[in-house]
Amino acid sequence: MMVVPKSFTDEIFGERAGEIREQFSSGADIDSFQHMPFILIKRGNRTRSTVDQYFSRHFFKPKLILETENTITTLAMAEAGIGITICPELFLKTIHVTSSRSASDPLDFFPLTDPSTICKLVVGYRRDRYLSHFGERFIQLAQNVLGTAEEQSAGA
């Protein structure tokens, strides 16, 4: 998920910013942000590898102003209007609670729709084996947080 300070969207698109926000809510055009500053996780992190591959496939060279080891730091800097970052949607759902955003939120959240940026979280366990209370609770919490109420078949 590309996390963009609203001030950047306003600066780039001016009077069309509202229309562009709606359009980009189903997938962002990364090229529109070519000249804006980016704050990314340091290389060596799986998220950064995915982001770098995405940039490469789209022939996009970000104007990188800072690399950090902490995703929360990148998000805080985006909230402060310093730069654009890219965070895993799972992180945003569990840490930032994107569902409770309001019009006063200083950020725009634009999904990256490239299939290579989409991952599934899978919890596997053997049905014929004992699953601890903690294991059951983890699955229940994951389903609640991620909004998936249906139990997936696990079976290896």
Region spans (language model):
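Short, well-ordered beta-strand segments
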Residues: 39, 85, 122-124
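Hydrophobic hinge/microswitch elements
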Residues: 44-105
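Secondary-structure junction motif
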Residues: 10-13, 17-58, 131-139, 149, ...
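A late-sequence structural motif
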Residues: 106-152
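Structured helix-beta-strand junction loops
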Residues: 35-36, 58, 80-81, 118-119
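Conserved sugar-transfer catalytic core signal across GT-A, GT-B, and GT-C glycosyltransferases
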Residues: 29, 73, 119
